[in-house]
Amino acid sequence: MRLFGKGRSEGTTVFFATDLHGSEVCFRKFVAAAGFYGADLLVLGGDITGKFVTPIVEDGAGWWAELHGRRIALKAGELEGFEAQMADEGVYTRRMTAAEHAAYEQHPERVDALFLAVMTERLEHWIEYAHERLDGTPIRILTAPGNDDPYEVDDVIRGRGGDRVVLVEGELTEIAPGHQMLSTGWSNHTPWDTHREFDEEALRVHIEEMAARLSDPASAIFNIHVPPYDSTLDTAPQLDEHLAVKTSAGNLLTAPTGSTAVRAAIEAHQPLASLHGHIHEAGGSVRIGRTVAINAGSEYGEGVLRGVLLTVGGGELKRVQATSG
């Protein structure tokens, strides 16, 4: 798949961000980054979608919502502002009557259908927004959904994205002359049993099937959601059997949580750079051999878009720059 645009004499500039988790403001910033940073191509890493739905309930006496276990009273004139705030934080909302809310509590299996409905609405809105804002430009958005993203995400992107928002899961994409990008949003196993998880051997095979088709691994970019194991890009809090954070003497205990298969692939093929996310608090970069491995990090809940600019050309990685805003 060949998707590079005009290119410049100094190379092609890619803007990468990841783990937006449904944040409206972060997606708007992501689309705007093409013009702001002068990028030729936008790459959206995995975990595109939000994590939960907050009902906004009308019970006859007024409106209320539950957030983080706390009930919040809302006036009718405050609803749109609250919904916008929640959208910027990546939270989905749905207005409903008290009877409808009670029905969801009595039939929790219906919540999954509600989640997919509101998730689809936002994703379709994002794709429409990208079409509008990038109209008349050659800028494309390449994306590989992450382990937290339901499979329905792929269908929405295929159905609505056209040539503007392109699904690249499991694909090799030529992002600049002589430079291919290998992409997958699948991860190794997590404590949460999410949608797209492989054991390490299956993930190794998935990556190697793509890597074997690279024209020149040394000039490639790996776009792999989960970071390499024990790289500092994968350092996360340790969890106990109840998924509570472990501490010792008041100090947070951490451990590497990345993928051994991803690390082995980077060590074996030595691409120019590898782009990761997944562990929000482990943003940074490190060298693995000649490869510059990068976790862009994520602060989507605060409305902050963290990203990375890369310029490639002539078989070289000409620039790497972290961004935040």
Predicted regions and their residues:
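Divalent metal-coordination and catalytic microenvironments
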Residues: 19, 27, 42, 47, ...
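Binuclear metal-dependent hydrolase catalytic cores centered on His/Asp/Glu-rich metal-binding motifs
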Residues: 177-220, 241, 252-258
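Active-site environment of divalent metal-dependent phosphoester hydrolases
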Residues: 21-25, 49-53, 139, 143-155, ...
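Core catalytic region of metal-dependent phosphoesterases/phosphodiesterases
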Residues: 2, 25-176
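Binuclear metal-dependent phosphoesterase catalytic core
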Residues: 2-4, 22, 172-177, 194, ...
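Proline-aspartate-enriched helix->loop->beta-strand connector
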Residues: 34, 38-44, 241, 262-266, ...
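Active-site-proximal segments of metal-dependent phosphoesterases and phosphodiesterases across multiple
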Residues: 109-121, 221-270
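Active-site-proximal beta-strand elements of phosphoester/diester hydrolases
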Residues: 11-21, 178-190, 221-225, 292-298, ...
